């Protein structure tokens, strides 16, 4: 997992990923499992990482294994730890996915395999975009409630009693975490 910031103009800066892959390429050998966990746009594992590793002349899924598995840690959260947070993984080939899942099964309670690295990359962007939108929404609702003289906390607590279709978010400063505000930018950039 390496940093994946945005450039000064708001484009994904994947230079850290490329540097890491260049280092791996110098020592790549048979039976190596490589898993990218850095948040990035769909296609990075296939179009960038795999493309750089092809220079090794080894065969993916046979000689070495390449997967994407989004980092899903919530620092400081005692309820959801590395062990009990399901791990999503998608490999370049079925053999890659299988070996990656085998590794993570030693660490986490549940591994969720998906059909491709692009799917796994998109999972992380959906999760964080969903969070970003809903935090923004609840902050707007808090402003409206204040203007209306309504207790936003009472509204949220009452809405949270609905057993489906509502997930509780609470208002506060900012979005929380460095990645939440920038992750939707990756998706926006890729779709251009």
Predicted stretch roles:
Residues 1-192:
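Structural/interface elements that position substrates and couple domains in central-metabolism enzymes
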């Amino acid at each position: 997992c390496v940093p994946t910031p945005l450039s000064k103009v708001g484009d994904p800066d994947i230079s850290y990923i490329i540097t890491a892959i260049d280092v791996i390429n110098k020592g790549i050998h048979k039976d190596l499992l490589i898993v990218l966990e850095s948040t990035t746009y769909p296609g990075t594992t296939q179009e960038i990482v795999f493309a750089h590793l092809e220079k090794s002349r080894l065969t993916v899924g046979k000689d070495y294994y390449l997967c994407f598995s989004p980092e899903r840690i919530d620092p400081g959260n005692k309820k959801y730890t590395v062990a009990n947070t399901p791990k999503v993984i998608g490999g370049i080939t079925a053999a890659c996915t299988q070996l990656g899942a085998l590794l993570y099964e030693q660490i986490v309670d549940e591994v969720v395999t998906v059909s491709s690295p692009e799917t796994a990359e998109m999972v992380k962007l959906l999760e964080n975009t969903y969070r970003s939108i809903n935090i923004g929404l609840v902050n707007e609702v808090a402003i409206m409630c204040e203007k209306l003289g309504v207790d936003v906390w009472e509204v949220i607590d009452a809405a949270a009693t609905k057993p489906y279709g509502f997930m509780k978010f609470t208002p506060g400063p900012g979005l929380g975490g460095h990645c939440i505000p920038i992750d939707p930018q990756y998706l926006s950039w890729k779709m251009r």
